[in-house]
Amino acid sequence: MELRTARRLGLPISALGYGMWGLAGWKDTDEAEVERALDEAVASGVTFFDTAFAYGEGRSEGILGRLIRRHSARLVTASKIPPKNRTWPAPSQARLDECFPPEHIREFTERSLSNLGLPRLDLMQFHVWQDAWALDERWLRAVEDLKRDGLIGSIGISLNRWEPWNGLAAIRTGAIDAVQVVYNVFDQAPEDELFPLCQKMGVAVIARVPFDEGSLAGQLTRDRVFPEGDFRRTYFNAENRAATMDRIERLEKDLPAGMTLPEMALRFVLSNRDVTTVIPGMRRVVSVRGNVAAEQAGPLDPIL
């Protein structure tokens, strides 16, 4: 497993990380299979695990804590503070007081540490962000206090979908160590401004949603309708589903012999050296093995 580094993060992490959103609270989650998948990831060299308090109200953090206690390998831990108003994404008019007042930042850092059973997190992230808050000294002081007290090693921001520009001001403050952003074959906008700035500032890039919520993993068809309560029902509405399937069918025609669509999608993200790690969700052992194999296959041929 390749290890990549970013100056501000201060430690190497696996190029293939593990996104833990779908591990708690989903109706079709097999908890025993989840544990096996996590163990398989560690055995394969995955060292970076990204969770959040909002993933099952701390349950996903608990799963990560148990994983850490099962293994002697040094695993890099990342979690996220939920916005106080519990609104995703952060509305453009949202005030810092509504989302991340200082006492809320500390409270949920401590709650995450309790769920994990750890004295310190390698990386804590704001689960939503608006750059209107960038120069507000209240969150800056709160983060400095957490670092001073040894509760976190680094701080990051998780950017709203389709808004890779809505974090540039925060990065320019020099206080941000990592940025999490949607980046995949269909959404390459972070390449324009975000990635170059992160490289300049030494900020780690955590790429999420590499499979476009499943469409690039073969989970979408022209007639599939997701059940009520599944966010993909709204995301893949009739119009978006048709347009996405058109693009997928064009991609499939250009795939080299023997290469699957999910392999191409993951290798596309990993081929960009600006990306420090990519965090697909993996609830099954077969998914872990497939993604590890894609990582080990190396960068895509530039001709693609």
Predicted regions, residues:
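Alpha-helical scaffolding within the catalytic cores
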Residues: 1-5, 108-110, 164-165, 190
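Conserved, mostly hydrophobic/aromatic
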Residues: 6, 18, 34, 49, ...
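Beta/alpha (TIM)-barrel catalytic core signal, keyed to glycine-rich beta->alpha loops juxtaposed to Asp/Glu
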Residues: 57, 128-304
